[in-house]
């Protein structure tokens, strides 16, 4: 998006929300065509909005190490948002080092691995056609079996700490990276 478009879109959103600012503005799914949507122009818009007090923090979601470095060339990238759980941990090797180096926080999305870590699924659980979990490597039989075995072993902790699998998994995940933020997004209680 162009600088003008980013600023106009945020102004419209603020009006719709009835507020003067938002805490974090994330860019999502970074473009592969950096000439069409250069990070420099995006950061110029975001830094302008931050200076105006319309956003408090700048975030980018689903990024590479190169993206993070480029964002930081043009201003302060405050936080990245990435898929991260006790099953999906590529952030630790691929992005954590550069985030530590550049002072960028990490927010984890899908910490319950699309429900797999809630204890609600079995090896016999199937999903409707078109459900993204059908293609998620974590839900494939070999990995699902390993996860279910771990959850079975953790049953003793549910009673000991009087909590659910979700509570336990989120607590564990929050301790895996110093300062990690967890984004919850359950569809059902």
Mark where each language-model region is.
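Generic alpha-helical secondary-structure signal
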Residues: 9, 25, 171-172
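Structural motif corresponding to the early beta-alpha repeats
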Residues: 1-3, 28-29
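Short, acidic/polar
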Residues: 2-17, 64-70
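Active-site groove signature of glycoside hydrolases
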Residues: 14-33
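Beta/alpha (TIM)-barrel catalytic core signal, keyed to glycine-rich beta->alpha loops juxtaposed to Asp/Glu
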Residues: 30-189
């Amino acid at each position: 998006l162009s600088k003008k478009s980013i600023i106009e879109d945020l102004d419209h959103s603020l009006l719709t929300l009835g507020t003067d600012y938002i805490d974090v503005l994330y860019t999502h799914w970074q473009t592969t065509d950096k000439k069409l949507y250069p990070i420099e122009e995006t950061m110029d818009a975001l830094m302008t909005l931050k200076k105006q007090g319309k956003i408090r923090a700048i975030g980018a979601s689903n990024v590479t190490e190169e993206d993070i470095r480029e964002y930081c060339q043009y201003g302060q990238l405050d936080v990245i948002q990435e898929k991260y759980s006790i099953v999906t941990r590529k952030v630790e090797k691929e992005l954590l080092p550069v985030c530590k180096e550049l002072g960028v926080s990490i927010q984890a999305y899908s910490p319950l691995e699309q429900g797999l870590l809630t204890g609600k699924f079995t090896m016999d659980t199937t999903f409707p056609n078109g459900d993204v979990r059908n293609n998620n490597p974590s839900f494939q039989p070999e990995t699902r079996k390993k996860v279910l075995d771990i959850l079975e072993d953790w049953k003793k902790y549910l009673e000991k700490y009087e909590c659910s699998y979700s509570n336990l998994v989120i607590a564990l995940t929050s301790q895996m990276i110093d300062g990690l933020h967890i984004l919850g997004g359950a569809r059902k209680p």
